[in-house]
Design a protein with these regions (language model features):
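Short, Lys/Arg-enriched N-terminal segment that forms or immediately precedes the first helix
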Residues: 2-22
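Short, cationic-aromatic polyanion-contact patches
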Residues: 17-26, 42, 73-98
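Short helix-to-turn junction characteristic of helix-turn-helix DNA-binding domains
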Residues: 36-39
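A short acidic, leucine-rich amphipathic alpha-helix
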Residues: 45-49, 64
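Amphipathic alpha-helical dimerization/coiled-coil segments
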Residues: 91-120
């Protein structure tokens, strides 16, 4: 899923928009996305900053990656030889527009250090 100035018209048939909206309003996912807008972070940094359990955070990060809301910014090898993954939000902001005719969900791409291609 590519995010730039992406819009979703919410209706019962549009499952993608409903899934994205549900996920973003989940307190857990919201904390993860907000935590990684400015800087990429490891799972441990995200957990510590937001007081989140590690196993649940890994599951949410996988789901957010699958939905195209997070990406792997970089992978480094630490002094113990272990791989450390840094995650970053693909979105800078979300706008929900409600009126009598429609419900519109609009994403603004996070321009900070995004990879050239964000269609993971």
């Amino acid at each position: 899923m590519m995010l730039s100035e992406q819009r979703y018209l919410l209706n019962q048939e549009d499952k993608n928009a409903s899934i994205l909206l549900k996920e973003l309003f989940d307190g857990f996912s919201y904390k993860i996305v907000m935590s990684t807008i400015e800087d990429s972070k490891t799972v441990f940094e995200i957990c510590k900053e937001n007081d989140l359990p590690i196993s649940s955070t890994y599951k949410k990060i996988k789901k957010l990656k699958d939905l195209g809301l997070l990406f792997i910014d970089r992978i480094v090898i630490n002094e113990k030889g272990k791989k450390v993954v840094f995650y970053k939000s693909k979105i800078q902001s979300v706008e929900l527009i409600l009126n009598k005719k429609q419900v519109l969900l609009q994403f603004k791409k996070n321009e900070r250090n995004l990879p050239y291609s964000i269609s993971q």
